[in-house]
């Protein structure tokens, strides 16, 4: 654990739920705004680590990952840094982090991958998930069959999803 000074401001990524208006870090949440004053907000240096954090909240809608900067007192915890002051710089495009989720084979990521695909109407991701070799992933597609029918029809997977749901 290392503290860095204001001159060593940190850039990184942070997970946010637009629906709840909260920021997430290890199960705790905080009210959101443009700038935050809370020493427990985590900034992940790598987008991959922020995506892993986001995958802990698969039932949340409107999950967003922000590119952020922190300044003031910053504590280094290795994969993440905790800062007293935090500024939202920009939203990371969903395509970027959905692609990282797609590289994960663990079925725990399935619900978030489906949610992200539905929100972005990423047909390729949905189709791939519907044909995944992992039964749990296919089941998660079936459980999330409220994906817009038009999208599923375009994919040609509506029949597969309905069959799995039965």
Regions found by a protein language model. Give the residues of each.
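Short aromatic-glycine-(Arg/Gly/Cys) micro-motifs in beta-strand/loop hairpins
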Residues: 2-41, 67
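N-terminal regions of proteins, emphasizing targeting and processing segments when present
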Residues: 10, 19, 55, 72, ...
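N-terminal compositionally biased, intrinsically disordered segments and leader/signal-like regions
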Residues: 3-6, 36, 65, 76, ...
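Alpha-helical scaffold segments
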Residues: 94-166
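Alpha-helix C-terminal capping segments
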Residues: 8, 35-37, 54-57, 116-120, ...
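Hydrophobic beta-strand residues in large extracellular and virion-surface proteins
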Residues: 13-15, 44-46, 50, 63-68, ...
